[in-house]
Amino acid sequence: MRARSTLSFAATLILATSGAVSAQQTSPTMDADGTIHAQDVVIPTSDLLSAQAKRLLIERIEHNPKFDPGPNLVERARAASLEMAQPVVKRWQEIYPATIQRVTMNGVPTDVIVPKAGIAAKNRHRVLINLHGGGFFTGGGGAAGQVESLPLAGAGRVKVVAVDYRLAPENKFPAASQDVEQVYRALLKTYKPENIGIFGCSAGGALTAQSTAWLQKQHLPRPGAIGIFCSGLMPGFWTGGDSSHVAPVLNRQLPYPAERIGEGMSGYYLSASDAKNPLAVPGISLSVLSHFPPTLLVSGTRDVALSNLLASNVALKQAGVETELLVLEGLGHGDVFLFAGAPEAKEADALIWRFFDKHLGR
């Protein structure tokens, strides 16, 4: 108890003295419900970031897409997503050259990505499945999946199958999970389930969790390991908790209004009733989670999804699942893949592959 009190006092002292640097600054105030109001707060980029990552962070923040409500919002968002992804794909191809072949598997379009350096001997009987991000309504057509797949294919010298799953609002849950199931069934004809890994970022991270639950329902063998990146598996997926309020500010955006927390599930794809369905929101059922394979969770300190992901890690551990947690200093939502070539991204890709290499069968 005394140690705890001493630590609490030390933390309070550090915070108090750090806030006394400038007498001209206004101290934060607190409402009765604990809400903090801060003025004159200055937040620099992390001094722990590489120069390249800092430059990419500033460029991303400067060019954050802004979408005014109005007609053709989905079409405009899809065009912006493609515009952002294409130069990143080009850069990853320069770092990790790969062949990309469009292949239809059980009626579902995919991109099969194979490193030009060749598949490592130990990975000849292994494969990764990528589920791209994009809020469940953008990212189709291949580029978004290639942004996430090329660095893993290159870092691990392993084949990656990027699934171009059906998008909202044209399609609703469980369309994307059904598409993943069909690709998984096709790969099971060639690969043992324990040799298959599934990963995705943002909506793709949420879909990784949904698909893992969906495969359970279909009585299919579980994959060897999964990676949930830039998303959690609790309601809201990439909203909820402190990061919903803090991360937007760190990325020069307005925080989520309190009444909108939870909309991260994307109303385009999920209905209100889906929030109570563990096939749509696996985090609400420890029973469903208990059947998950080893799971890697990846986020960054500027990622709006960080709090949900941290809560998801606790839920998975409560369910008895082996997890690893990787939180990247100074990086925001999806930057682990968007910052092509930055030391932080390459180091993270190597760690991500190390997780799959550890847990996948041979």
State each model region's role:
Residues 19-23:
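Sec/Tat signal peptide C-region and signal peptidase I cleavage site
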Residues 66-87:
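Phosphate-/polyanion-interacting regions in eukaryotic proteins
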Residues 24-31, 35-37, 42-71, 90, ...:
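Alpha/beta-hydrolase superfamily serine-hydrolase fold, recognizing
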Residues 8-18:
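Bacterial N-terminal signal peptides
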Residues 1-9:
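Bacterial N-terminal signal peptides that target proteins for export
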